[in-house]
Curated annotation (Swiss-Prot):
Gene (UniProt): dnaK
Conditions for induction: By stress conditions e.g. heat shock.
Basic and acidic residues composition-biased segments: 625-638
Keyword ATP-binding: yes
Biased composition, class Gly residues, residue ranges: 602-614
Gene3D superfamilies named among the record's database cross-references: 1.20.1270.10, 3.30.420.40, Actin, Chain A, domain 4 (3.90.640.10), Substrate Binding Domain Of DNAk, Chain A, domain 1 (2.60.34.10)
Name by which UniProt lists this protein: Chaperone protein DnaK
Length: 638
């Protein structure tokens, strides 16, 4: 059985881990970083960049650089108006009332953008493991709705991954933290404040069983919001000083976003920071600079409401778990925003104990996902995970009331049936409107899908018996069925409404993603081949200079001819011609080396061929070959 990787698909950063050698390993990406920015950029020529390369070019390409896409996952157009107003890229209303990202007229679903990030994580794992990866455990915020979970699973499918399990982020963090403590009896609180979401989960573990007692949170509260209060403050300060509105300039706003994020991070270890943005915007034809000092106290005042917003979910989670603060043995901080000192003070004050610093807030969720993957493949035995559904689920009944079938914090998998009847005489059809939330009226909750049960035998109101069954799987994804007990007619739906994607659309997007991955691979191979040729040209020219008159004229001529052929092929970027020219050059140089070796005897040894710096064999006739040496290409930074 292949490896199941663990992926933390974050709002700001993503991370991938795998269980290997009896422990989880966080895998560094191709840039050498253990976390990857959840950013996708579309650049000229149709090229796509993901992660750090995308982040580096964001300032000069703000309208085609996509970040914080997780905030749009599984949401309707109406639910993302606040987010749409914040981002510099264009978000439009698409099919089924869903948000789509418009890049040069091509509309991308949030799932497709997320899939591009997942492909990067998949490739990172494959490069490390040296084998194809097809299965993953992906984490989501504990308070994600059914449609948001479904959208995450779809993103995995588009990326070419079979999602074996969707795991709540705080639960994954608890798994990572408690793996070596699984046989202790402990109650822990996981406080997870990430880039876009906030979760609080209360768990109990002992005897290898990890049980979630309750969870609460806010899927629109996170580091992005803390950045935004700094951005808003800077915009207002500049308006007061210069009378100009920075929000009209997308490039300036992108610079503000980066500066705000940097300032927020610096204020976790310093009491003040300087924000210095020269030439931020021209005013009346004159370039203006933005220079401001932001103190930690001012930042905490700006973010006061956001910090306090973390409190109510904590109270609710403790109440739902039936515990008092003194019952909690340990508090675990997860997510980059949990590093904010005022947030840590709030947590310490609420729980009455200093939070544990024993886990890496940026990596622990991915590590927990890898642990869950190892549990599924039996690499880890004796560990049982009992998670819960974060929100109540039910249907709309007479009078627009929400009737709950499954309550929040019910252990999953879960199944519940209830019998309903018709609201009018001779009614032959009923609409099952599925809802998720905690409010009493249907309109106040989130609609996650609806379907019709037809063919009901005509009868007086209240006589037909319609059995509605809710079935939630281990991923927290819901299936609903309705059955007329009299006729035996049944209708079922796997809730996919808010994601708005059919199986056919997912398959089409998957094919496009694979095609793009293949195109990216070919582009990389092309660059590698050009670099290899460049290296061979450089090493050949150097060796021709070094050898000088020692090289016989009849051997030098074919080398120079092959070298010129390689230069021409390199200039034309003709990969086939490059291969041919490199082979000819190698043959010519080896012939010269063999003759020189014969002339010099054992004293001088063999000269290396031109490809030594490009991973080619130096001298196939020599018995003293060491391992290949790779030349590094350096680019001078001006």
């Amino acid at each position: 059985m292949g490896k199941i990787i663990g992926i933390d698909l974050g709002t700001t950063n993503s991370c991938v881990s795998v269980f290997e050698g009896n422990e989880p390993v966080v895998i560094a990406n191709s840039e050498g970083k253990r976390t990857t920015p959840s950013i996708v950029a579309f650049v000229d020529g149709g090229e796509r960049k993901v992660g750090d390369p995308a982040k580096r070019q964001a300032i000069t390409n703000p309208q085609r650089t996509i970040f914080s896409i997780k905030r749009f996952m599984g949401e309707t157009w109406d639910q993302v108006q606040k987010e749409t107003a914040r981002v510099p890229y264009k978000v439009v209303k698409g099919d089924n009332n869903t948000p789509r990202v418009d890049i040069d007229g091509r509309l991308y679903t949030p799932q497709e953008i997320s899939a591009m990030i997942l492909q990067k994580m998949k490739k990172t794992a494959e490069d490390y493991l040296g084998q194809e990866v097809t299965e993953a455990v992906i984490t989501v915020p504990a308070y994600f709705s059914d449609s948001q979970r479904q959208a995450t699973k779809e993103a995995g499918q588009i990326a070419g991954l079979e999602v074996k399990r969707i795991v709540n982020e705080p639960t994954a963090a608890a798994l990572a933290y408690g793996l070596d403590k699984a046989h202790k009896d402990m109650k822990i609180a996981v406080f997870d404040l990430g880039g876009g979401t906030f979760d609080i989960s209360i768990l109990e573990f002992g005897g290898g069983v990890f049980e979630v007692l309750s969870t609460n949170g806010d899927t629109h509260l996170g580091g992005d919001d803390f950045d935004q209060v700094i951005i808003d403050w800077l915009v207002q300060e500049f308006k007061n000083d210069e009378g100009a509105d920075l929000t009209k300039d997308p490039m300036a706003m992108q610079r503000l976003k980066e500066a705000a994020e940097k300032a927020k991070i610096e204020l976790s270890s310093s009491t003040s920071t300087e924000i210095n943005l020269p030439y931020i915007m021209p005013v009346d034809g004159m370039p203006k600079h933005l220079v401001k000092t932001l103190t930690r106290a001012k930042f905490e005042a700006l973010a006061h409401n956001l910090i306090q917003a973390c409190l109510e979910p904590c109270k609710k989670a403790m109440s739902d778990a039936g515990l008092s603060n003194s019952d909690i043995d340990e508090v675990i901080l997860v997510g980059g925003s949990s590093r904010i000192p005022a947030v840590q003070e709030l947590v310490e004050k609420f729980f009455g104990k200093t939070p544990s610093k024993g886990v890496n807030p940026d990596e622990v969720v991915a590590v927990g996902a890898a642990v869950q993957g190892a549990v599924l493949t039996d690499e880890i035995k004796g560990v049982v995970l009992l998670d819960v559904t974060p929100l109540s689920m039910g249907i709309e009944t007479l009078g627009g009331v929400m009737t709950k079938l499954i309550d929040a914090n019910t252990t999953i998998p879960a199944r519940k049936s209830e019998t309903f009847s018709t609201a009018a005489d001779n009614q032959t059809e009923v609409t099952i409107h599925v809802l998720q939330g905690e409010r009493p009226m249907a309109a106040q909750n989130k609609s996650i899908g609806q379907f019709n049960l037809t063919g009901i035998a005509p009868a007086r109101r209240g006589v037909p018996q319609i059995e509605v069954t809710f079935d939630i799987d281990a991923n927290g994804i819901l299936k609903v069925s309705a059955k007329d007990k009299a006729t035996g007619k049944e209708q079922a739906i796997r809730i996919e409404a808010s994601s708005g994607l059919s199986k056919e659309e997912i398959e089409k997007m998957k094919a496009e993603a694979e095609a793009n991955a293949e195109a990216d691979k070919k582009e990389r191979e092309k660059i590698d081949k050009l670099n290899q040729a460049d290296s061979m040209i450089f090493s050949t020219e150097n060796q021709l200079k070094e050898l000088g008159d020692k090289l016989p004229a009849d051997k030098k001529a074919p080398i120079e001819a092959a070298l010129q052929k390689l230069k021409d092929a390199h200039k034309a970027q003709d990969l086939s011609a490059i291969d041919t020219a490199m082979a000819e050059l190698n043959t010519a140089f080896q012939a010269a080396s063999a003759e020189m070796y014969a002339q010099s005897g054992a004293q001088g040894g063999a000269q290396a061929g031109p490809g030594a710096g490009a991973g080619q064999q130096a001298n196939q006739g020599s018995s003293n070959n060491k391992e290949d040496i790779q030349d590094a290409d350096f680019e001078e930074v001006k």
